[in-house]
């Protein structure tokens, strides 16, 4: 559903942010 999709997007952004550090 929408919640799972939003969670996946947030997780992806968090991963990219951590990699950027």
Swiss-Prot record:
One of its GO terms (cellular component) is extracellular region. GO terms for biological process: defense response. It is found in: Secreted. The modification Leucine amide is found at residue 21. Its main location: secreted. Expressed by the skin glands. Keywords: Amidation, Amphibian defense peptide, Antimicrobial, Secreted. It comes from the Eukaryota. Antimicrobial peptide. Belongs to the gastrin/cholecystokinin family. Magainin subfamily. This is Peptide PGLa-R4.
């Amino acid at each position: 559903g929408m919640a799972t999709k939003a969670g996946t997007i947030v997780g992806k952004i968090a991963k990219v942010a951590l990699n950027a550090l």
